[in-house]
């Protein structure tokens, strides 16, 4: 059985978030009101609520890089990850860390991007 998650986070601009998650990322919108919207987030449920997002700081030490904390991510098959990266790049997404491979040639090698 595959375990699924539900994550609810704040976004400042719900219309902009609908465009990004629905249009750019290709997620299907589900239930919604004027203050929140649910998305099928690659098989998981992402619930975006209008409000002030968590503050982030670059305090996570990963492979000699300081990454934003807190953060969340997806583990995708590489072809699906690459297609998503291309969609995000084509849309002019402002990346914190552009798509790249981390831990190259090592156990746990991973493709990553932060935006």
Question: Which residue stretches match the model-derived regions?
Answer:
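Short, conserved charged micro-motifs
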Residues: 16-17, 79-84
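Short glycine-enriched loop/turn motifs at secondary-structure junctions
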Residues: 1-3, 65-69, 106-107
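N-terminal beta-strand motif that seeds the catalytic metal site of vicinal oxygen chelate
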Residues: 1-15, 71-72, 76
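Vicinal oxygen chelate
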Residues: 85-115
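Helix-adjacent hinge/juxtasegments
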Residues: 55, 60-75, 79
């Amino acid at each position: 059985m595959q375990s699924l998650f539900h994550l609810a986070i704040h976004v400042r601009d719900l219309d902009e978030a609908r465009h990004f998650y629905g249009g750019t990322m290709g997620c299907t919108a589900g239930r919604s009101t004027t203050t929140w919207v649910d998305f099928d987030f690659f098989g998981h449920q992402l619930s975006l609520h209008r409000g002030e997002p968590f503050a982030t700081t670059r305090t996570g030490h990963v492979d000699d890089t300081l990454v934003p904390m807190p953060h969340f991510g997806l583990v995708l098959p590489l072809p699906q990850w690459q297609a998503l990266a291309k969609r995000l790049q084509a849309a002019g997404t402002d990346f914190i860390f552009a798509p790249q491979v981390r831990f190259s040639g090592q156990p746990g090698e991973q493709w990553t991007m932060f935006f």
